[in-house]
Amino acid sequence: MELMFAEWEDGERFSFEDSDRFEEDSLCSFISEAESLCQNWRGWRKQSAGPNSPTGGGGGGGSGGTRMRDGLVIPLVELSAKQVAFHIPFEVVEKVYPPVPEQLQLRIAFWSFPENEEDIRLYSCLANGSADEFQRGDQLFRMRAVKDPLQIGFHLSATVVPPQMVPPKGAYNVAVMFDRCRVTSCSCTCGAGAKWCTHVVALCLFRIHNASAVCLRAPVSESLSRLQRDQLQKFAQYLISELPQQILPTAQRLLDELLSSQSTAINTVCGAPDPTAGPSASDQSTWYLDESTLTDNIKKTLHKFCGPSPVVFSDVNSMYLSSTEPPAAAEWACLLRPLRGREPEGVWNLLSIVREMFKRRDSNAAPLLEILTDQCLTYEQITGWWYSVRTSASHSSASGHTGRSNGQSEVAAHACASMCDEMVTLWRLAVLDPALSPQRRRELCTQLRQWQLKVIENVKRGQHKKTLERLFPGFRPAVEACYFNWEEAYPLPGVTYSGTDRKLALCWARALPSRPGASRSGGLEESRDRPRPLPTEPAVRPKEPGTKRKGLGEGVPSSQRGPRRLSAEGGDKALHKMGPGGGKAKALGGAGSGSKGSAGGGSKRRLSSEDSSLEPDLAEMSLDDSSLALGAEASTFGGFPESPPPCPLHGGSRGPSTFLPEPPDTYEEDGGVYFSEGPEPPTASVGPPGLLPGDVCTQDDLPSTDESGNGLPKTKEAAPAVGEEDDDYQAYYLNAQDGAGGEEEKAEGGAGEEHDLFAGLKPLEQESRMEVLFACAEALHAHGYSSEASRLTVELAQDLLANPPDLKVEPPPAKGKKNKVSTSRQTWVATNTLSKAAFLLTVLSERPEHHNLAFRVGMFALELQRPPASTKALEVKLAYQESEVAALLKKIPLGPSEMSTMRCRAEELREGTLCDYRPVLPLMLASFIFDVLCAPGSRPPSRNWNSETPGDEELGFEAAVAALGMKTTVSEAEHPLLCEGTRREKGDLALALMITYKDDQAKLKKILDKLLDRESQTHKPQTLSSFYSSSRPTTASQRSPSKHGGPSAPGALQPLTSGSAGPAQPGSVAGAGPGPTEGFTEKNVPESSPHSPCEGLPSEAALTPRPEGKVPSRLALGSRGGYNGRGWGSPGRPKKKHTGMASIDSSAPETTSDSSPTLSRRPLRGGWAPTSWGRGQDSDSISSSSSDSLGSSSSSGSRRASASGGARAKTVEVGRYKGRRPESHAPHVPNQPSEAAAHFYFELAKTVLIKAGGNSSTSIFTHPSSSGGHQGPHRNLHLCAFEIGLYALGLHNFVSPNWLSRTYSSHVSWITGQAMEIGSAALTILVECWDGHLTPPEVASLADRASRARDSNMVRAAAELALSCLPHAHALNPNEIQRALVQCKEQDNLMLEKACMAVEEAAKGGGVYPEVLFEVAHQWFWLYEQTAGGSSTAREGATSCSASGIRAGGEAGRGMPEGRGGPGTEPVTVAAAAVTAAATVVPVISVGSSLYPGPGLGHGHSPGLHPYTALQPHLPCSPQYLTHPAHPAHPMPHMPRPAVFPVPSSAYPQGVHPAFLGAQYPYSVTPPSLAATAVSFPVPSMAPITVHPYHTEPGLPLPTSVACELWGQGTVSSVHPASTFPAIQGASLPALTTQPSPLVSGGFPPPEEETHSQPVNPHSLHHLHAAYRVGMLALEMLGRRAHNDHPNNFSRSPPYTDDVKWLLGLAAKLGVNYVHQFCVGAAKGVLSPFVLQEIVMETLQRLSPAHAHNHLRAPAFHQLVQRCQQAYMQYIHHRLIHLTPADYDDFVNAIRSARSAFCLTPMGMMQFNDILQNLKRSKQTKELWQRVSLEMATFSP
């Protein structure tokens, strides 16, 4: 249709600068290539009438003659001379009215020169390939280089003398001949290649603009006729003497012929030629077309297009490091590029010139189009591309990979197919020219058929499948249009060809001399330059080709010329007989379209659903080639008559009659935009048995009955008589016996094949009445009959609005394998409807009185509800068509009524009531509404400003934002390009919104909330709030909504608005998750209904696809959700993601419910974050079906996490996507994260950044502006770009299972670069939500970079960021951890405390280096030293606890959401700490396995970062003696803590280090069986130890007797809220009184240095304990290291020596119990015997040396000494293996040290002597033994 070229008047369409350039390779060597010199015919239309135009903007203006008479009455003679000059050859004038007065001759000659400089521009550009020559000629004209202009009759000559500064010097003689306002030939002496040179242009412009300055003379023959004989002789002799050299030979030859006695031609012909008198009456007046130059230029252009083009990368990054776009994005670009890009540009510009020539009724249109067509068909590459693209299964063969290698040729192939389709569209318009004679139409038909055969021939030489020939539409749309008669369809007096013209036209064609060897008719199109020729002008404008060209019809057998009804010549029988009811049924005879024995012409065409090949059951059938083959998806269609009556013409003998919907009018578009991607419609039919895989019938190939083939009358009024189909697309049925009559007419050679290829043509006149009228309207508009076209389009527009197309999708069959819904018919109807709407808009908007109707048509098109397209190419085309309609709508001025309509639509969008079924979202409509209501600056000035109201902008904004939040109902796996298109439209709308409101942060937040789908659980980083979905199990029979319909909802999903009861209960969408919110507000769903949609529904309701979820996800959570609504920008930090989140794999199709997380279930080392698993929430995973998926069942039972920590079972909904390949990379449920979505949002982020002003990296080398204005990007937009980029990274991680192990990502480097540029705001956002987006090393690196900034706020934010990654210390290297600790220390002590706690917490799962932990311990000690003086009031707020034991500190933002308590969760078991005595019965404290069942208390901080107030720090036990509790649950009501009783050291059960008490990692959970077992605490005999707190808690009994004075501050332990104690099982517990009585007496006196200690501030004491605790953890980590043969294992001073000794000092400072605990830890962690010995000796020194033997008997100390002795034995054996003489001294010293170690135990010396004996027997040399013996002899301990 005309849509592509609708914007001609603005000059926007055909300059290639405005079209999309995907690669700039065409510019690389533009000047140097010979092919590039053509410049692609740019500039053939003036872009805008500016001061450069001589006409100032009148488009050429009239001639000087008109100007002279401005304001005067123009005489009738002048007016008549002008009309005669335009329409009638001067020779005819002379013959009809002899003699013509000379003055009248001069006036006719004066008006015969063209008046419009645009014509000169066009033909100059055509000849030269660009407008450069025209511009130079215009320059010469302005410089007054045209001298001595002279017009003699119809001949204009002058001398052009370029000024001295113009390079070519000298004068040029220019001559131009013209006739009937057309330049018919031109010549110049400059010798330029093209005839339309600069000088010719200068002369023409001079004649147009300075007509009065041209000397005007009568034709030479007129002047000669007035001379006497003497004057004639003088004239001849003077002429010869003036130019003797040039003229004399010719003059002598003419004299010889004249004087010859024989009958020479010059003597026998009457009269003589006169070049100045104009052409003869037999000559056709056509503009001079420089064909040879034009043909050469077209060849060069096509050659360059077909050849390989270089791909130029501007930098290495773009080639190697940038991520390749995913297939969906690549395919979208590949398919959109030919629609928008227009390549090759030169050919498209020529095609646009052809279209403009049609409009001007320039008879060169057809010759130019013919040259183009011939040249294109000579390139087999072009025909091969065209053929392959149009016959490929989905009409989109785009491989869609990177667009570099294969993608490049794909783009070229699609561009080529688009170009060829546009050519066919133009040929269709050429044959539909209302003024075309039937004879000429038949000639064109023959030529078109030959071209079709030529394409097929070229293809056969290639490697294409022969079986697809009939699928290839090629020229058939144009051939079908040849069978059309204006006289019958839509006669227009004075416009359409009438019988009075016919006789002249035929005589004319016979009279034309033909050029030998011409293969092409030059005058394919008769001239139609008069506005309305009258039937009574016989000699006026000859209609047939001129003398230079030969008719197309020569040598073609008449049988191939098509049906004869087009001609009135005798002997041609009409082949169309009237069927019942007036329907014409075309017998397949004429036009060679019959097929012997065929079931209606065996034309085949593949119809495919998107990218699907033929259905398998069709492929199993077989059928001979001539039988009727039906569409692949025929059986899935619904709504056709079950058994149509047999047609009288067809006996109905061959099985069931087949009936077909009307073909789409793919070729009726007037603009190249709407050429059909694959003009084949789907055939809906009950196919005959058997079908070859390739033989799918295309509908427009089938010789079918008229639109009224079912017996429908052709007129619209009679249409209701048949009720089989209620839309325009009627059913056709064919039979096998139609082709019998056609065989006799077959012509020889090749005719059979042609007959085969053209079998099934459907003549245009057999279409429905409205289709025929559309074709008429397009032809009228294309050929310049705008008033007639306008009248017709009004009628068509009203009909379209009154009878909208039916786009409902039929439900799939209830049974059988093929339950895939076919949307082929609906897709074709939709694309044709949009084509028609665009055409109607174009025509109607030309007249102000039709603007309202145009507006209604445009809105109708934008509101069209269609299903997803059946092929990828059509999906892209439909989206492009919508955008074109929107662009056309924006040009229409809107009045009050239109504005009220816009407000109404905006309201509906905002409220979500616009549509009830939307796989395709109305985003174009929303964009248009936004433009109209919110962005008045984008509207044309013609808009009615008075129609605005104050609330318009807010309404438009809310409607646009609501549209952004809509969600489609189709999955990316089934319709990837629809999802891609939806994303792109959303991105464009969001971009417009963000730019418009870039200074309004509240609006920007709303935009981003909808665009980034922050209410959806699937798309945001997995935080704890995601686990608390209240969805419950739904019926298992819920069907997947992947296609748009279900058995109970034929065609459309049932709307579930707040008012419609339907089968679902109110609130039934509560579990649907954050589905398409469509503007629904919270009031639509009662919050109190947490059940899911299908709960309690009847079974049929369960099968009904649910409507799009109309509630935001926070409502979907119901009242139990506890969802705190925190988005990315919220101040509180959401909790971290669970460990499995890192490996989300959204492509696993079977896990589609909330209860079946799509996670790869490999436990990551330590996970990335401590997840507070709470008490096993309902939906503990992110669902692949995501709770925002429409119609997918969010079936997650309220499973409870078991006591083992909520390890989740992989529950799969069986049979949900049966047979689907799990390795598919696109999600099978709507609105899921996908690779394509991630790519899109990254690109959007970069676009927003560019719109914000670009980042600094793009302007490194630009000079800073001196204006001092705003520097750098717009901050708000920059932040938006950052958030979008972060969101994209999150999506990317969702679909990249191994993202946590990445080492480099260009996306991450972009994010970090922007964060550095934005500053603290971006870092704050990252602190909130980096987990799920970045890996801990990436965050640590960014924090480190940011800490070096000058801005203190940024440094502070960098420290916060560093702190936030320390809980993942196991994923960081020591340098990163050290740097993060330094950053926190630089801020303040509180942050350092948090950092230390975070590292310790991370270390409990392993993976943190001991060196790091020692560093943390030193930091704690540094804090102790800072606060030892008691000045800790500043940190009171951070460490104080509320009465309930809940930490009220700064981590409140990290906790679980409030109110998550409840009685329904599993009890958490705490380790049993039963204390037993060996010989005496001691009361046992059993910390049992059941907890208080009271209501839980919500706590607002993360247990992971709580100060370590759990039991273990104060229990003097060895690191492994406490088991670790499962996930924290309820804090208990406060009660006195039980004391822990010391027992002898006989039992050493291997438990878990107490440090694990605070951990929440799922993998470190104690199973229930272990949790209930009793564990002993072996403690040396000493005073009772109570569980000590860090600070006082009111309301608790305080123990007054403590073992160490250091602890005497009267504080009670604040038990970690998650670590609750059970009731004490066992009644006789005297220790629970306020004055505990010692159970064991005879303890050691306290260490000397502690007996006199001063009272210490409890805060500093807390730091001291923490330092000790972390040091002990480091010791444990040392022991966990692999016991390999590393040299450091037995080193005298390994790296950790100083740290271990420092820790011993710390233990001694705390008390003897801590020293004993240290000894146990050291025995396990230290490997070096030398260090162990030093520890033993130093410990003995620190304890009182007087009681050394008592100490040595202590179990912990004894264990340490034994470990030291074992280490010496291992060391000696190790050294003996690798000993060399050089090492003897060292070895002897080691033996000496070992002896002193063995002396510490009674049995030690025996062991030592055994070692010596072994040494003596070893293979070492005697010398070594002698030295050892000597040393032992002199040894004195």
From Swiss-Prot:
Residues that bear Phosphoserine: 36, 48, 53, 437, 567, 1153, 1156, 1160, 1267, 1836
Main location: cytoplasm
Gly residues biased stretches: 55-65, 579-602, 1119-1130, 1447-1464
Keywords tagged on the record: Cytoplasm, Metal-binding, Phosphoprotein, Ubl conjugation pathway, Zinc, Zinc-finger
Pfam families xrefs: ZSWIM4-8_C
Positions of disulphide bridges: none
Record region (Disordered): 45-65, 514-727, 803-823, 1016-1232, 1442-1464, 1635-1656
Compositionally biased spans, kind Basic and acidic residues: 523-532, 566-575, 1210-1226
Positions with biased composition (Polar residues): 1019-1040, 1144-1159
Modified residues (Phosphothreonine): 1139
Bias-annotated ranges (Low complexity): 1174-1209
Subcellular compartments: Cytoplasm, Cytosol
Role according to the record: Substrate recognition component of a SCF-like E3 ubiquitin-protein ligase complex that promotes target-directed microRNA degradation (TDMD), a process that mediates degradation of microRNAs (miRNAs). The SCF-like E3 ubiquitin-protein ligase complex acts by catalyzing ubiquitination and subsequent degradation of AGO proteins (AGO1, AGO2, AGO3 and/or AGO4), thereby exposing miRNAs for degradation. Specifically recognizes and binds AGO proteins when they are engaged with a TDMD target.
Record-stated family: Belongs to the ZSWIM8 family.
Descriptive protein name: Zinc finger SWIM domain-containing protein 8
Source organism of the structure: Homo sapiens
